[in-house]
Amino acid sequence: MAGDKPMSPFWSPSRHLDRRPFLQARGAVTGALRGFFAEQGFVEVETSVLQVSPGNETHLHAPRTEIMRPDGSRASRYLRTSPEFACKKLLAAGETRIFEFARVFRDRERGELHLPEFTMLEWYRAGAPYDAIMADCVVVIARAAQATGIGTFSFRGRTADPFAEPELLTVAGAFEHFAGIDLLSTISGGEGNRAALAAAAVGKVRVAEDDTWSDIFSKVLVEHVEPQLGQGRLTILFEYPSPEAALARVKTDDPRIAERFEVYACGVELANGFGELTDAEEQRKRFMESMAEKQRRYGEAYPLDEDFLAAVAAMPEASGVALGFDRLVMLASGAIRIDQVVWTPPADER
């Protein structure tokens, strides 16, 4: 607002003093989680920030840069949106349990829960089903709360007990319960029927003429489902529909469902995990479809990382998860904005 006093820079001693307890909590959580992974026999890895492809999801946007080779020629590179591609290459190399506190980057993201640069905690277990990674998430979140001494997470008037047994809820069950939509009836042969979901969503969300099945799904999820999740305790939302599989494998006994889950606390998404897809040709097909949609919507598309696709074909069966570390620290420390828990928040913070 005009006339509002500008916020002091983060290095202002008075502002830093206010933020310091949250930053100390960040250190405590980091140490506690490294201890958990050490107990479990994980190896901590550090993978490259600069990538040939930052990821191939339609709605994720990555900062782009150039590198100059010794001969003066230039090559495009991207700041990664996730360490996933690099970590899976390490699984193909023979690593079996790895984790990384990864600095990642996303354009077009800023707010109470979003930063353009943030920390993603990712870990992978070779030879493990995805419910093993779900169980890891529950322990990791409890360890974070234990490290700071907080008994209850709180955000925007919602609370969650990080030590309670989590709620397990299928995506189809959530759509039926919170939106009155029979989601699986709108999927056939692994493909979403746009007309069927649009009809089911009438009166529940606004559907635009150019909305895809995935767009309508996301609107219902955001407006009707997510606000109800993680209330009183954690919610694990699992069995995502196959059109939203991303890098997850589809269930062998039901092609409408993918081995994908998300974890919520206080309505906040904390983690997104997969039973990992190891079919390189299927992964290529999904990437190409996503990039075609990205080109249509945003006028840009990212290249495919052919080295990654080769590694997918060589990967063992595995499961993995990406957890928003800054969000976890925010809840575990009692902070109300994500910038309170990062040491050097963006200079444009207001």
Feature annotation, model-predicted:
Residues 143-268, 289-315:
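Metal-assisted phosphate- and nucleotidyl-transfer catalytic regions
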Residues 280-350:
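Active-site pocket scaffolds in enzymes
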Residues 2-132, 140-142, 226, 330:
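Class II aminoacyl-tRNA synthetase-like tRNA-binding/catalytic domains
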Residues 23-27, 31, 39, 43-44, ...:
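Conserved structured core elements
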